[in-house]
């Protein structure tokens, strides 16, 4: 384990004394450091009546137990302090370490022995081996009462609210959209879990179209056959209009009786562990599926601003700007009298996407979004540079299969009988509008491009994203991060995983950093906490994180010529190979990386260290033997070496306590293991869209074309002597349509190059 501590805030000495005393730790400057440490430990051992026993059970050094040490006249040394500190953090001497100084350096322990008051204060704010802050571990065991009142320590809210008798209720928010055009505002179901508290509390809201259930059979039937040829497109210029959102004007709302109690109780639901962690710390949890989902109204409009408006209206309700009812009759209105009006959003993938969209509405009350692996423009999810593409791991998926998956109203048989005809008409229109035939950008995609409205963002923004996320590719977070206005506070956790959550990783205090930010922004806890702009997981070693100033924006490039000759790529495969790759795209990837398919393979040995930060640009001069074509490219860190593997694996099951023995979570981490290669970046382009998205151009057979396009942005470090491998090819059996046409691309390597954005070493 290595310590990477970002949630700790420097605190004034007088405030440390006050905060410690409120927890029952009394530091006396008139006592020796040794006496203060003993008192601190005996207070920490509050679960024992006889605190001599745990002192005797612990070690001061390799020869002496702690009780004997405190009974002796020996001075407190750095070595003894570190030995005690590591035991408090659940490490075992003689098992986890034998040389405490070597272990301190190996783990990059954040505390330097000196000022004992500050040392003890920071120690309470340091993560244990099992993933909880020491103070959170002690509070979960009962250090202070569960009094349903906010308590902040080092600017972070403590778990002092009972999660076991939290209020669980349902309301139906009256939205400003009528997606099913029945003449009434769509009602949106809101599932609420909130702490019992006499005053107002903030909310964390997860906007998830999946939350009320999914229609997997319908979605599977809507998947597309990828074994089709690339379409030849007529040259033209694409035009789009500024997106419009028509909202209902509720100037004369239907009267409803105002009541103070909800009528529908919330049973068991699936929850998100970051929300679970925040609930006993005094944050209400809201789960909202939105339009077109089970127990809500309307149609599934999939990513447009009608869908986002309905989520926004929940925030409006929390701030008194929209109504909510106790049930679907709309006869009894209920206000969010428990809300302080401040909201943060959470969740990954589609959930993080809705956070991005909500932020671009500029809605008052949305203080922070935590957008984990979120989409910033839906075109870049299902299309790329004029090509129909599939998100990594999901060949054949397109927007209407996602619509089928999330339109959960059909899971209610009565809703199916009443509304399925209207839904099918809506689905058919969507199927036409997304234009799978050409892969071109159009008004449908323009209406689902949140980057156009990034200037409206007012909330503080936290992103998480993985360099190996080929589902929601890194381009999404890169574009959103760079599109935000300069005055907006923005932060990015950029890790080396795939499409995964990171709130229960051992190597970083992510959830505690979120606690510190939300406690400051939503609760008003006073602290000097500042989250860095970019927190990057160093790919060159295990459990190491660094802070950077930006993602992209580099002024230097490493320029690499591709070669000295011309080489060709054959598009067509034998029937046997084609069928084999179509059935198992993983076999295609394996052979591609080993240089065994129809491809050009180019290798470089680095002459100096490389620190890549941004989007690599591929500059090509090529020609096609026919009137169309696609080019695929992947850049690899090639050669046997230790690297992060992209899926976190459990270190210890159910050891991370989200409250007081509440929703225990697994402690996980990305393994750091020997692999033959690593994909650094990739990209795909339709030769007919080589200039820009809005231009469809002719491809004349055997005529040279010169163009550039960017591969997926990333942050990646390599050392002198490492090997870069670029593979150029046509059809990608995971991502693109699987064209069978017999044609070839010829690349002029001497007139082609690669530009890698580089930064000086951190």
Swiss-Prot record:
GO cellular component terms, semicolon-separated: cytoplasm
Active site positions: 349, 469, 499
A GO MF annotation of the entry reads:
serine-type peptidase activity
Which locations, inside or outside the cell, does it occupy?
Answer: Cytoplasm
Main localization category = cytoplasm
Lineage top rank: taxon: Bacteria
Catalyzed chemical reaction(s): Hydrolyzes Xaa-Pro-|- bonds to release unblocked, N-terminal dipeptides from substrates including Ala-Pro-|-p-nitroanilide and (sequentially) Tyr-Pro-|-Phe-Pro-|-Gly-Pro-|-Ile
Q: What class of enzyme is it?
A: hydrolase
EC no. given is 3.4.14.11
Q: Name one GO biological process term.
A: proteolysis
Function, as annotated = Removes N-terminal dipeptides sequentially from polypeptides having unsubstituted N-termini provided that the penultimate residue is proline.
Record text on subunit structure and interactions: Homodimer.
- NCBIfam families, alphabetized: PRK05371.1-4 (NF003783)
Q: Which family does it belong to?
A: Belongs to the peptidase S15 family.
Identify this protein by name. Answer: Xaa-Pro dipeptidyl-peptidase
């Amino acid at each position: 384990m290595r310590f990477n501590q970002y949630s700790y805030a420097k605190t004034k000495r007088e405030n440390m004394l006050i905060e410690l005393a409120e927890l029952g730790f009394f530091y006396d400057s008139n006592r020796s450091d040794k006496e203060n440490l003993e008192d601190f430990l005996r207070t920490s051992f509050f679960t024992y009546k006889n605190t001599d026993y745990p002192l005797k059970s612990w070690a001061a050094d390799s020869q002496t137990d702690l009780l004997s040490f405190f009974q002796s006249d020996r001075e407190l040394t750095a070595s003894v302090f570190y030995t005690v500190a590591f035991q408090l953090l659940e490490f075992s001497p003689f098992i986890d370490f034998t040389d405490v100084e070597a272990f301190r350096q190996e783990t990059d322990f954040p505390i330097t022995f000196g000022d004992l008051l500050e040392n003890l204060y920071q120690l309470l704010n340091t993560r244990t081996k099992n993933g909880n802050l020491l103070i959170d571990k002690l509070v979960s065991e009962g250090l202070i009462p569960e009094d349903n009142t906010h308590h902040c320590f080092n600017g972070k809210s403590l778990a002092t609210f009972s999660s076991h008798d939290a209020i669980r209720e349902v309301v139906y928010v009256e939205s400003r959209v009528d997606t099913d055009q029945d003449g009434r505002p769509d009602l949106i179901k809101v599932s609420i879990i909130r702490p019992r508290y006499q005053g107002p509390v903030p909310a964390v809201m997860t906007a998830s179209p999946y939350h009320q259930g999914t229609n997997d059979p319908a979605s599977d039937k809507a998947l597309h056959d990828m074994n089709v040829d690339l379409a030849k497109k007529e040259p033209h210029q694409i035009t789009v209009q500024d997106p419009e959102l028509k909202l209902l004007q509720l100037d004369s709302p239907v009267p409803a009786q105002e009541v103070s109690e909800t009528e529908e109780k919330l049973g068991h639901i699936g929850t998100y562990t970051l929300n679970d962690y925040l609930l006993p710390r005094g944050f209400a949890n809201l789960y909202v599926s939105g339009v077109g989902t089970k127990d809500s109204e309307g149609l599934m409009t999939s990513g447009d601003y009608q869908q986002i408006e309905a989520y926004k209206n929940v925030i409006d309700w929390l701030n008194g700007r929209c109504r909510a009812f106790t049930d679907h009759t709309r006869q009894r209105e209920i206000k969010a009298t428990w809300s302080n009006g401040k909201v943060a959003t959470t969740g990954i993938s589609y959930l993080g996407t809705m956070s991005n969209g909500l932020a671009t509405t500029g809605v008052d009350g949305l203080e922070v979004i935590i957008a984990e692996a979120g989409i910033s423009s839906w075109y870049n999810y299902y299309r790329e540079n004029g090509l129909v593409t599939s998100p990594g791991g999901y060949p054949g998926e397109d927007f209407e299969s996602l619509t089928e998956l999330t339109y959960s109203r059909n899971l209610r048989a009565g809703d199916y009988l009443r509304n399925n005809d209207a839904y099918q008409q809506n689905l058919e229109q969507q199927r036409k509008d997304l234009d799978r035939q050409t892969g071109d950008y159009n008004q449908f995609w323009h209406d689902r491009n949140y980057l156009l409205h990034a200037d409206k963002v007012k909330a503080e923004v936290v992103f998480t994203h993985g360099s190996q996320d080929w589902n929601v590719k890194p381009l999404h977070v890169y574009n959103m991060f760079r599109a935000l206005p300069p005055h907006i506070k923005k932060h990015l956790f950029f890790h080396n995983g795939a499409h995964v959550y990171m709130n229960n990783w051992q190597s970083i205090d992510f959830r505690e950093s979120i606690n510190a930010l939300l406690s400051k922004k939503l609760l008003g806890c006073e602290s000097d906490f500042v989250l860095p702009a970019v927190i990057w997981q160093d790919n060159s070693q295990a459990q190491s994180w660094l802070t950077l100033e930006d993602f992209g924006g580099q002024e230097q490039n490493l320029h690499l010529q591709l070669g000295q000759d011309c080489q060709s790529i054959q598009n067509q495969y034998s029937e046997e190979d084609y069928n084999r790759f179509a059935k198992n795209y993983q076999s295609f990837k394996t052979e591609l990386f080993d240089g065994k398919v129809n491809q050009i393979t180019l290798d470089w040995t680095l002459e100096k260290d490389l620190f890549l930060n941004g989007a690599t640009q591929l500059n090509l001069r090529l020609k096609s033997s026919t009137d169309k074509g696609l080019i695929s490219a992947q850049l690899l860190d090639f050669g046997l070496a230790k690297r992060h593997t992209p899926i976190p694996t459990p270190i210890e099951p159910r050891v991370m306590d989200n409250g007081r023995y509440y929703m225990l979570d697994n402690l996980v981490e990305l393994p750091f293991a020997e692999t033959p290669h690593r994909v650094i970046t990739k990209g795909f382009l339709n030769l007919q869209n080589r200039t820009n998205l809005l231009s469809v151009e002719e491809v004349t057979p055997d005529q040279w074309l010169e163009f550039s396009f960017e591969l997926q942005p990333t942050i990646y470090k390599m050392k002198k002597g490492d090997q870069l491998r670029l593979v150029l090819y046509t059809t990608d059996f995971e991502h693109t349509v699987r064209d069978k046409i017999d044609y070839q691309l010829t690349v002029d390597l001497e007139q082609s190059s690669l530009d890698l954005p580089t930064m000086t070493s951190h």
